[in-house]
């Protein structure tokens, strides 16, 4: 039953993505960054891609049944980050969708899933670009997931509820993606008066009006999706050690996953 529901969910998510129209959004556009900065961000994300590949390979090898959930996390990221809403100055803002995957599989796996999502969007939706793939991956698929996963673990360690942990992870992971993108643009294009700081504040201000409510909405949506997974796919969440289950001595999973 769950697999049938998951396939239907994936189909609907991809159908929604196909209807998304290209627009200038917060992803840095093709050719916008100078060559030296574009190359710099590729070098920065390369170790995360290597780590992410190892993490995904280990997870899938340990439990092949998690492939469907991994695909769902990627589809969720693809669709949410492709839903562009009008912002000021004729640009667009959009959710990122990285919080769910970060909570489920950790930040390493999301560096790969997010990178694949950004590559497809650059090729199919004219969203972002190939030359700026490194920069966009660092902001949305590295910083965002690390912040999301770190907050999730912190809230859970402080005995916070699961819905609160997921909400904060998705919301602040989204916001930090845009803070990072603003910093990347500011480093490449510092203001004549005020330098990098002034330029960063300017870029952040452009998107703040729409991005804050979008991030909060993404937080609530991610909680809803997580609750559905907890209801209809509890076994996989137990395998990932997200929800309590039987220990290995009791016949449960060993839970040795690289996150």
UniProtKB/Swiss-Prot annotation:
Domain of life: Bacteria
Membrane topology: Multi-pass membrane protein
A GO MF term: cobalt ion transmembrane transporter activity
Signal peptide, first to last residue: 1-25
GO cellular component, one term: ATP-binding cassette (ABC) transporter complex
Family matches, as HAMAP family: CbiM
Its biological purpose: Part of the energy-coupling factor (ECF) transporter complex CbiMNOQ involved in cobalt import.
Record NCBIfam families: cbiM, PRK08319.1
Protein family according to the UniProt entry: Belongs to the CbiM family.
Protein name, UniProt field: Cobalt transport protein CbiM
Species assigned in the record: Moorella thermoacetica (strain ATCC 39073 / JCM 9320)
């Amino acid at each position: 039953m769950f697999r049938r529901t998951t396939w239907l969910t994936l189909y609907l998510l991809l159908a929604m993505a196909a209807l998304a129209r290209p627009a200038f959004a917060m992803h840095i556009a093709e050719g916008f960054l100078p060559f030296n900065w574009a190359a710099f961000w590729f070098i920065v994300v390369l170790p995360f891609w290597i780590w992410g590949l190892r993490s995904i390979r280990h997870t899938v090898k340990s439990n092949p049944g998690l492939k469907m959930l991994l695909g769902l996390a990627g589809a969720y990221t693809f669709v949410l980050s492709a839903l562009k809403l009008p912002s000021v100055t004729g640009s667009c803002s959009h959710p990122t969708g990285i919080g769910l995957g970060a909570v489920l599989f950790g930040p390493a796996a999301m560096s790969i899933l997010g990178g694949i999502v950004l590559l497809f969007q650059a090729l199919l939706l004219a969203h972002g670009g190939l030359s700026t793939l490194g920069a966009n991956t660092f902001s949305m698929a590295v910083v965002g997931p690390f912040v999301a996963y770190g907050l999730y673990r912190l809230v859970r360690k402080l005995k916070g509820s699961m819905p609160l942990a997921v909400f904060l992870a998705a919301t602040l992971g989204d916001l930090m993606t845009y803070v990072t993108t603003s910093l990347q643009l500011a480093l490449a294009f510092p203001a004549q008066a005020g330098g990098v700081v002034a330029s960063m504040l300017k870029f952040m201000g452009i998107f703040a009006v729409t991005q804050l409510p979008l991030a909060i909405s993404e937080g609530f949506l991610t909680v809803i999706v997580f609750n559905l997974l907890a209801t209809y796919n509890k076994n996989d969440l137990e395998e990932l050690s997200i929800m309590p289950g039987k220990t290995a001595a009791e016949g449960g999973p060993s839970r040795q996953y690289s996150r």
